[in-house]
From Swiss-Prot:
Classification via InterPro entries: EF-4, EFG_III/V, EFG_V-like, EFTu-like_2, G_TR_CS, LepA_C_sf, LepA_CTD, LepA_IV
UniProt name for this protein: Elongation factor 4
Topology in membrane: Peripheral membrane protein
HAMAP family: LepA
């Protein structure tokens, strides 16, 4: 056991986590050169296309160190995006140490900090690594100082390497083996194994990634899930070297995978503890704190026949992604679907794309909203996650919106632009610290503004140098209103949005103008209106298509023309009473982009 090392790799987006993992796998001979490819751990197509890591992946390797001993390294490659931070915290729970990878050109960024603090809170040994020293812009001395300044860990002798060229990766491994403590645990105690992650395989059922904390798990053992008390047979178990390799047992301190032929998706929840049925452990291991979704959106299948398969797909996906929340919802405009909760907009995009790809569904998404806290006039407090559920205005005593605490790190020269952006987003500055050339800014910004397009705008105003990390702070009373969209006098529930009173006329006008371009012209006028309660704040009209009834009149009496026009008018009026308007899919997406184009 003293030769086992469990560690994660944490870093900001694009600082080279996955490339470093590739090199480590190569040095330890986990894959032959023929099987090796770039970013071998990013196995999802989506991850390869976007060049980001979404799921944490684990690998077990054997490394022969310079002291002649052979060490077993279990390491987990983690995502860097703020939307997937729960993946990181789950991975860290299975480790004793973490490699903090920092780009020697870019320096410390917000995500580096956030993930590093998570690791320190969990009492992990953090080993700083300066990556990308082959770049002409690399300045390892300055970055080492920055790490000490901002993060507060000693980085004077931090390992320097270039994961791309492979320089110094050997030193990283040596340092790892030296600094990261071996796992603690009692191999003879009753089995306790933590479920770090699980996913659904069409042939095997539920596959779980587990970390054995105490005891030993052997093939054929009867295991019990502590939270539900159900027992299963351990049919197959083993490790990833990134390939799935079968083993006969997983010893104390090891990380591996387990198949118990669980067909029920809820059979082995993430964060649960497994133990042996005949000799159970006293108590479960502390799991993970549940993450609360920050953004909600409705997802509806385009054709209602897909509803069943959509429900199954969501179930399988939520097994793999513990932070996805969903409940059934129905809408008059879109039929039956689900209200889903996500950690952020990127998360929402990824989930939608995975559903469409992996399960072959066509989906419509409604505009994302955050959760509002509403105090009713009878002092009851309700939480509203969709504009259509907002109670009537006369029943609301106070409406509170969620405020996010945003930590930003950026170079000094972009400070002005970023502050302007934060103020425009109704932000309040709470802290500002200078670290050399970097500025650490803390703002409290309404969550609704953060999830809309704050991240994109922050990146564009700072030319990509600013980085952001945010978390939910509290609910705060605010003057929010619901803007309804009426089409020919009928409310369309899927198009409603909740916005701040000051922005309402502007958001309403913009939405109405956008919709006007998207709804195809009909044989009669279509009035598109935006309203707060019964007060109309904006209107535009999609003009009717009409035949020129006067084409056959040459000269002649004006009353003849009037008669024809009058007749046409009456026909259109009749048509308008019976006609209904088809809304194209783009109309629902229009809401997403309100307030984006250069405003």
């Amino acid at each position: 056991m003293k030769n086992i090392r469990n560690f994660s790799i944490i870093a900001h987006i694009d600082h080279g986590k996955s490339t470093l993992s590739d090199r480590i796998i190569q040095i330890c001979g986990g894959l032959s050169d023929r099987e090796m490819e770039a970013q071998v751990l990013d196995s999802m197509d989506l991850e390869r296309e976007r060049g980001i890591t979404i799921k944490a992946q684990s690998v077990t390797l054997d490394y022969k160190a310079s002291d002649g001993e052979t060490y077993q390294l279990n390491f987990i490659d983690t995502p860097g995006h703020v939307d997937f931070s729960y993946e990181v915290s789950r991975s860290l729970a299975a480790c004793e140490g973490a490699l903090l990878v920092v780009d020697a050109g870019q320096g410390v960024e917000a995500q580096t900090l956030a993930n590093c603090y998570t690791a320190i809170e969990m009492d992990l040994e953090v080993v700083p690594v300066l990556n990308k020293i082959d770049l002409p812009a690399a300045d390892p001395e300055r970055v080492a100082e920055e790490i000490e300044d901002i993060v507060g860990i000693d980085a004077t002798d931090a390992v320097r390497c270039s994961a791309k060229t492979g320089v110094g990766v050997q030193d990283v491994l040596e340092r790892l083996v030296r600094d990261i403590p071996p796992p603690e645990g009692d191999p003879d105690a009753p089995l306790q194994a933590l479920i770090i992650d699980s996913w659904f395989d069409n042939y095997l059922g539920v596959v779980s990634l587990i970390r054995v904390k105490n005891g030993t798990l052997r093939k054929g053992d009867k295991v019990k899930v502590m939270s539900t008390g159900q027992t299963y047979n351990a049919d197959r178990l083993g490790i990833f070297t990134p390939k799935q390799i079968d083993r006969t047992e997983l010893k104390c301190g090891e990380v591996g995978w387990l198949v118990c032929a669980i067909k029920d998706i809820l059979g082995a929840p993430v964060g649960d503890t497994l133990t042996l049925a005949r000799n159970p452990a006293e108590k479960a291991l502390p799991g993970f704190k549940k993450v609360k979704p920050q953004v909600y959106a409705g997802l509806f299948p385009v054709s209602s026949d897909d509803y069943e398969s959509f429900r199954d797909a969501l179930g399988k996906l939520s097994l793999n992604d513990a932070s996805l929340f969903y409940e059934p919802e129905s809408s008059t405009a879109l039929g039956f679907g689900f209200r889903c909760g996500f950690l952020g907009l990127l998360h929402m995009e990824i989930i939608q794309e995975r559903l469409e790809r992996e399960y072959d569904l066509d989906l419509i998404t409604t505009a994302p909203t955050v959760v509002y806290e509403v105090q009713m006039t009878n002092n009851e407090v309700v939480y509203v996650d969709s504009p259509s559920k907002l109670p009537p205005l006369n029943n609301i005593q106070e409406l509170r919106e969620p405020i996010a605490e945003c930590h930003m790190l950026l170079p000094q020269e972009y400070l002005g632009n970023v502050i302007t952006l934060c103020v425009e987003k109704r932000g309040v500055q709470t802290n500002m610290v200078y670290h050399g050339n970097q500025v650490a800014l803390t703002y409290e910004i309404p969550m609704a503004e953060v999830v809309l397009d704050f991240f994109d705008r922050l990146k564009s105003t700072s030319r990509g140098y600013a980085s952001l990390d945010y978390n939910f702070k509290r609910f705060q009373a605010s003057n929010m209103v619901r803007v309804d969209v009426l089409i020919n006098g009928e409310r369309v529930d899927a198009l409603a949005l909740i916005t701040h009173n000051d922005n309402a006329p502007y958001r309403g006008r913009e939405l109405v103008e956008k919709m006007k371009d998207l709804i195809p012209r009909q044989q009669f006028d279509i009035a598109i209106q935006a309203a707060i309660g019964n007060h109309i704040i904006a209107r535009s009209t999609v003009k009717q298509l009409r035949k020129n009834v006067l084409a056959k009149c040459y000269g002649g009496d004006v009353s003849r023309k009037k008669k024809l026009l009058q007749k046409q008018k009456e026909g259109k009026k009749r048509m308008k009473q019976v006609g209904n308007v088809e809304l194209p899919q783009e109309a629902f997406l229009a809401i997403l982009h309100v307030g984006k184009d250069g405003k």
